[in-house]
Amino acid sequence: MASLRDIKGRINSTKKTSQITKAMHMVSNSKLRRAEENAKSFYPYMEKMQDAVTAIGGSNSDANHPMLQKRPVKKTGYLVITCDKGLAGPYNANILKSVTQKIQERHNNNPAEYGILVIGRVGYDFLRARDYNVEGQIIGLSDQPSFKSIKDISHTAVSRFETGEYDELYMHYSHFISVLEQEVHERKILPISKEEVSGESKLSNYEFEPDKDAILEVILPQYAESLIYGAILDGKASEHASRMTAMKNATDNAKELIDDLSLQYNRARQAAITQQITEIVGGAAALE
């Protein structure tokens, strides 16, 4: 049986850990609220962008922009959105499991058939350590990323499709549903499907100058990059929700462990006192 000193040391150590996890839970809660606000504030812009793309592409059945054209797939690009820090529950593991399974299924891990652009140190370290074909990365992204801060990697992803280096581009990220629920999504960004640019648009009665093809040349890359930015904002909310849940569970588990250790400590202390009393009584009896 552990000594009283050992048990007391474990209780104190667990209490300190509990204080840390509780503080991290509170920080994640605050960051989650800001991340949700950022994601929600981006929705109106994304809706307007979708309307513009639908108005131009949907009404132009002869649109011949490369980003709308399917072609034989020789190489596939994957944009993987993870985070820089751990202690976020299954957040990173689920995303990485999703993308590695798809790479195995589609390419049998042949590096000539795919390339990965990764956001987040956890994803980068994981994929590099396992010799996946990582061709670009962003590390150290802010909790409230600006469009400018992700411009390099989003532009790289889109331009590699435009130049033919990638024949299709997928994005893997965690979609925020609620504090307790997040889902890993795989979204095909490029080529943009005809269904995605078809349908009704609030801008359908507008006139476009100089012409729709010229506007498509500008707006389609912006649209694809906006999809990436929206997924990053969504992923940030998922990250903080997952970390908040993980820290709450850790705090609750620490409390249970402290209760168990306290009970164990009291029993050991009671046994020690009983032993001392027995020895005193036995010694007194021996003197009679």
Swiss-Prot record:
Pfam families: ATP-synt. Keywords: ATP synthesis, Cell membrane, CF(1), Hydrogen ion transport, Ion transport, Membrane, Transport. It is a peripheral membrane protein. This is ATP synthase gamma chain. The keyword Nucleotide-binding does not apply. One of its GO terms (molecular function) is proton-transporting ATP synthase activity, rotational mechanism. One of its GO terms (cellular component) is proton-transporting ATP synthase complex. Its main location: membrane. GO terms for biological process: proton motive force-driven plasma membrane ATP synthesis. Produces ATP from ADP in the presence of a proton gradient across the membrane. The gamma chain is believed to be important in regulating ATPase activity and the flow of protons through the CF(0) complex. InterPro entries: ATP_synth_F1_ATPase_gsu, ATP_synth_F1_gsu. It comes from the Bacteria. It comes from Macrococcus caseolyticus (strain JCSC5402) (Macrococcoides caseolyticum).
